[in-house]
């Protein structure tokens, strides 16, 4: 008759099995290919303000890959993720947040679809896989920085700028159609508020229409030839929102418009132009602004310029900036957001080679 195994032996066996299963699970997690990793990231919603779940996943995943990982609270329950090998002189960076609404993952033979596919869950995946390839090539002293809130004022980047580092170069990832961006336009958001005097619409002479005052100001702004830059092109203005009035039979006492300028010169110079046109006809409130950015070049790349803004203006302490990423900004923020699988796969090697090239350029 065979004796029963001691209880401690059984418990030890159970623990060994548990550890083995955890090891297998960790291995499966860390050996995800670029498309599997992108799918996993898209499946974790991270609309601006709710990035914690994807940050926790990234921290666990990067720790399992052998990175030293730091979580930095940019705001309550909104952690930035900084992962590094050694003391980085080159850092790959992009953002974890997306715009609303959430769009579920799907794919076909050519494309991956879903919220963040190109802006920027796919780019996160490409940067991580590039990091794996660098580790396999025994490259050290590089890092990955994934920040919250790029889509809503760059709060994560502004807080991450305080992380002590000695980085010489920052490779920022945004969808540039796999071209090296030579620069990106700045932005200036303004609210114009016109004041009038309410009256019965049958007696308009007794009132003053705030809407008509506002329309006059907007028409004058539309006729302005705003500054141009040889590289970035023209400053543009979008009248994004207009509201005002009480009812059709009331002379409107208040009206306002929200404008977004894509800027190729300094915000200060553009503000002087705006205020000169508006004069005293309306109040002007500036709610957001960042100057244009001119980025570094690397030989051998097709180049472009982009009209959108990035986290680069807020990451001034992370070295000289570069801007590159797979995917098209024209697909970002749309119901059919997507990224081409072949382009995403190529980006892994491009990011790796960029890190190697930049490290060699100054060593």
What are these regions (language model features)?
Residues 2-7:
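Extreme N-terminal basic, low-complexity initiation segments
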Residues 17-91, 99, 254-260, 272-276, ...:
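N-terminal helical capping/dimerization or prosegment-like subdomains
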Residues 46, 53, 73, 175, ...:
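Metal-dependent amide/peptide-bond hydrolase catalytic core
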Residues 86-146:
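Active-site metal-coordination/substrate-binding segment of hydrolases
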Residues 90-92, 171, 197:
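Residue-level marker for buried hydrophobic side chains located in beta-strands
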Residues 125-189, 229-230:
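Acidic/histidine-rich catalytic neighborhood of metal-dependent amide-processing enzymes
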């Amino acid at each position: 008759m065979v004796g029963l195994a001691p209880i401690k032996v059984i418990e030890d066996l159970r623990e060994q099995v548990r550890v083995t299963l955890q090891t297998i699970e960790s291995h499966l997690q860390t050996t995800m290919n670029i498309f599997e990793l992108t799918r996993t990231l898209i499946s974790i919603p991270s609309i601006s303000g709710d990035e914690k779940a994807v940050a926790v996943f990234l921290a666990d995943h990067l720790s399992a890959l052998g990175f030293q990982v730091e979580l930095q609270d940019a705001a309550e329950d909104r952690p930035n993720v900084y992962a590094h090998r050694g003391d980085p002189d080159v850092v790959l960076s992009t953002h974890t947040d997306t715009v609303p609404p959430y769009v579920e993952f799907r794919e076909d033979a050519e494309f991956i679809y879903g919220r963040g596919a190109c802006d920027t869950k796919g780019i996160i995946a490409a940067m991580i896989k590039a990091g794996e390839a660098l580790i396999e090539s025994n490259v050290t002293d590089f890092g990955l920085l994934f920040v919250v809130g790029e889509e809503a004022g760059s709060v994560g980047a502004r807080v991450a700028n305080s992380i002590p580092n000695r980085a010489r170069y920052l490779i920022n990832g945004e969808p540039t159609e796999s071209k090296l961006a030579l620069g990106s336009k700045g932005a200036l958001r303004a609210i114009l508020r016109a004041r009038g005097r309410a009256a019965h619409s049958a007696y308009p002479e007794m009132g003053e229409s705030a809407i008509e005052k506002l329309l006059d100001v907007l028409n004058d702004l539309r006729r302005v030839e705003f500054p141009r830059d040889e590289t970035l092109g023209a400053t543009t203005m979008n009248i994004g929102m207009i509201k005002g009035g009480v009812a059709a039979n009331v002379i409107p006492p208040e009206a306002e418009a929200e404008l977004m300028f894509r800027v190729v010169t300094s915000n200060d110079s553009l503000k002087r132009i705006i205020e000169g046109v508006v004069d005293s006809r309306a109040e002007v409130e500036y709610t957001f602004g960042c100057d244009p950015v001119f980025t570094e070049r690397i030989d051998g790349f097709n180049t472009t310029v982009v009209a959108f803004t990035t986290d680069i203006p807020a990451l001034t302490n992370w070295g000289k900036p570069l801007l590159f990423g797979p995917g098209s900004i024209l697909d970002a923020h749309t119901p059919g957001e997507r990224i081409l699988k072949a382009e995403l796969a190529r980006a892994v090697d491009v990011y790796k080679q960029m890190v190697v090239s930049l490290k060699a350029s100054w060593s």
